[in-house]
Amino acid sequence: GNRVTCRDWFQLSLKEGLTVFRDQEFSMDLCAEPSARAVKRIEDVRVLRTAQFPEDAGPMAHPVRPDSYVEINNFYTVTIYEKGAEVVRMMQTLVGRAGFAAGMKLYFERHDGSAVTCDDFAQAMADANPASELARLLPQFKRWYSQAGTPLVKARGVYDAAARSYTLSFTQSCAPTPGQAVKEPFVIPVAIGLLDAAGNDLPLQLPHWQQAETGTRSFVLTQETESFTFVNIDAEPVPSVLRGFSAPVVLDIDHTDDQLLHLLAHDSDPFNRWEAGQRLALRRALRAVQADGPVHAPLDAPVLDALRHVLHHPTLDAAFKELVLTLPSETYIAEQLTVVDPQRVHAVREAMRDQLAHALHDDWVWAYEQHQDNGAYRPDPRSTGRRALAGLALHMLCLAARENGNPVWPGKAYQRVKDAGNMTDRFNALSALVASGQPLAQEALGRFRALFKQDALVLDKWFALQAGQPDRGGQVLPLVRQLLAHPDFQIKNPNRARSVIFSYCNANPGAFHRTDAAGYVFWSERVLEIDAFNPQVAARLARALDRWKKLAEPYRSAAREAIARVAAKSDLSNDVREVVTRALAE
């Protein structure tokens, strides 16, 4: 950004998308094992799915290169940054890593000291790689810059035993977004592998290829409907599609539970291995959300056994195991539904978490004892992973203790708050106590604050942990109001405001979406209060109700009323007015 900058604000993703991509690649390069490298990729995709995909589907949807804006502050978004990084990543996929390096070299040679556009960047990449798919498809590829929305890719596989062939058929579409009713097909690189019954990658060969290639191969979708037929396939394979999350799309693929269990156990692509576990859990969560009556244990024995197997796997990275054993978030579950009852979603996910804590209790004990870090602190990826898995195990053991009354694990967590040799372990232990509603949590919170009350960033974490805790009976909103009155809380400090207000309104749906609408009243009060002195922060908070039209009643009407209450204020900033006006637009 210092050597080559943006010609105008519409080109913001030119440097911000590239910066995010560079950071992602650097972080992955610090890791050794493929499953450790995949941890960063998975974390980035979780942000896309829980923040950017909803933005693409909501009233503030905009292309990576917006066409217009009321207030530029509202376009420092996950679309500009994170989706922008995915566009850069797809370029790298289409030209290869060496080709991407050549493209960057040409870009800087051409434009050093200049203010340029997204088109200039894409052109440099294509010109440095004239024989690449990117160069051939450049005008169509640039639709990623001009079209808003998340493409939906449907994949269906058919095996022909007589011909010893397997055909994967793809259909791409993209829903209308504000101001863009019709979408043209995108260029979508889809990384594919096929697994045999033993879990090995099969050699991939199309009819016109001279020889097969084993492992992952990228195929490029450019039309609404396309098919690829693989030959010399002796038995029906299990497809592993969109490996490494090769494009920012929603994948609809008709895997059976057995196929997903096979991928979870064997897929050589760590991302899709994690994805198989998420799909198994998500499938059960949605089934439980849509069922009538009380929520019963949603996870069945095959899934629990598969997760147990991952936990004990001898070669998988500990950080990767922690991600596989972490259930899909309430936000992600809700995004899969047409109509959302936030309290039902919250109840289902809590039931799944409690079930996982109890069913794998002895395994969590093993995981904690094997991975707790009592030696000198080391910031390397392997040690980071061990701390993450030990933290999840302690969290689960404190959850189980809440039900069975066993004081041992809450006691160990409290001791860890007192004597941990690093912040990660100390905060994980505090989180385990707070999230499981343990009586020791209050004492631990007091001790933690006493230790770190001079450190503003740590105190932000302390506030956020309390405002973001699971709601058990409506206690979180009164607590949040108490935190606003805390002597260490200053609403004019953006980080402190985010730590309490955003942690509640934007990141704690089970507590925010109350049947009495008190969460929405609190939200509207805070948006108006903050708008008076910091419109940019207020506009970010205003977006907590972007997806109000998906809500079931009584939430939907109450949310609309709260948004209208904000919109009715005569002296709103442009920042907030743009957000609430677009939210209310039919």
What feature does the model see in each segment?
Residues 24, 67, 91, 171-173, ...:
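Structured loops at beta-to-helix junctions and adjacent beta-edge loops in soluble globular domains
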Residues 117-139, 144-172, 183, 281-285, ...:
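His/Asp/Glu-rich metal/cofactor-coordinating catalytic motifs and the adjacent surface-exposed loops
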Residues 10-11, 54, 79, 145, ...:
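A general structural signal for short secondary-structure junctions and capping/turn motifs
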Residues 50, 77, 231-586:
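Long, ordered, helix-rich scaffold segments
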Residues 10, 17, 24, 86, ...:
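Structural beta-strand/beta-sheet cores of well-ordered domains, especially the beta-sheet scaffolds
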Residues 1-158, 167-170:
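Hydrophobic alpha-helical and helix-loop surface patches within well-folded domains
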Residues 6, 10-14, 100, 113, ...:
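Short, surface-exposed helix-loop/turn micro-motifs enriched in polar/charged residues
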Residues 133-139, 150-241, 286, 333-334, ...:
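Beta-strand-rich binding/interaction modules
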